Amino acid sequence: MCIRDRFTSLTKEALPIIRYRTRDLTRLLPGTARTMRRMEKITGRSDDMMIIRGVNVFPSQIEELILKRAELAPHYQCVLTREGPMDNLKVLIETKPGVAPDGIEARAAAKMLQHEIKVYIGSSVDIELKSEGGVERSQGKAKRVVDLRHK
């Protein structure tokens, strides 16, 4: 079932704002009345989605797995490239301060993360560990996806 969300202000404090097709990813919760449905928290945006070898991948899925690893910092970037007909995804991840990117524990964490991503998402990725500050930072919204594929 296709549902188009419409948002508006219900108070007199602001002008009514109506937005269509917000591209927010969420799901409707069971409601008590048809006109008063509630939504679960927004999990991401559909325009952040990457298609890798026919698999829909969201940066938030990768971030969820990164945050489970104690050796890795939450600073990452997904780099998309194309070699021949195949799309490749490389994830650049910073290690936490005091953890060397080429150290045994960091490499073990990267290998485990690579396996978890393959199982969870269904597509293999390359992991490249960087030291603190090695992943490009941006002002405002973090730039999580860099697409280097030729259009």
Where are the regions a protein language model picked out?
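Active-site glycine/GP-rich loop and adjacent strand/helix microenvironment
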Residues: 4-151
